[in-house]
Amino acid sequence: KELEAIRLIKLGVIDMTISAGSLTNFAEILTFSDMPFLLKDTLAMHKLINSDIGKRIEREMIKKIGLRPLGYFQRGERHLTSNRPIKHPDDLQELIIRVPNAPSYVVAWKALGAKPTPMAFSEVFSSLQQGTIEAQENPFAMIKNAGFSEVQKYLNLTGHLITWGYPLVGEKQFQSLPKDLKAIFLQAAREMQVYEHRLFLDNESKLQKQLKDEGMIFVEVDKIAFMENGQEAVYESLSPQMQEVYKSIKKITQ
């Protein structure tokens, strides 16, 4: 759906969309906006987005895709759900985990000992129900909205990916605006970002309570063990040029 929206923006049928991960298909540097075990917490995410590398990512969106980011919004940490508690990477052995169709997800979970299985999100609930897969990973909002509490007992707080997205407008559409309207548009985007962050934080606490009320058991995990095992594999999968960018991100976000 996201790729279709991008196509329609290029055709001039629609003007705006929201990114959710598909941008990584267009340029290698964009993979850093959706990479497991890269960032340790939300503060690190904010540091990356507002750094020179974050601005480079935004420039690449304009150059390679023809889409201009209008600020960013938090999507929450991705956590692993399962029907057995997962506290350490050792508990993952042979666990069949649904992942998005993104190489870094496959590389990371395979390195941790699991069996990552790329699958469309629309197929996840029924596959969990039927036992085709045993686990999946998503932010609280996606876990709640998809009803995964009906087919998964444990919510393991891996926080393995700090996710964000971008409200996007077609660059051609943006450049067609008069100068004064561009300024108003960008100011509105800044106000939207502040408002969204406030809504996000409020919603996260509500979602956790709702998921617990639905019977999910929250499990604290050894985050350091997950990070150490996962990030090395992701790093090794990158090109030499992107490995240098990775190192820079780690310095920025410490």
Describe these PLM feature segments:
Residues K1-A44, I53-Q254:
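N-terminal secretory/targeting leader peptides
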Residues K47:
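Short beta-strand-centered segments that line the small-molecule binding cleft or hinge
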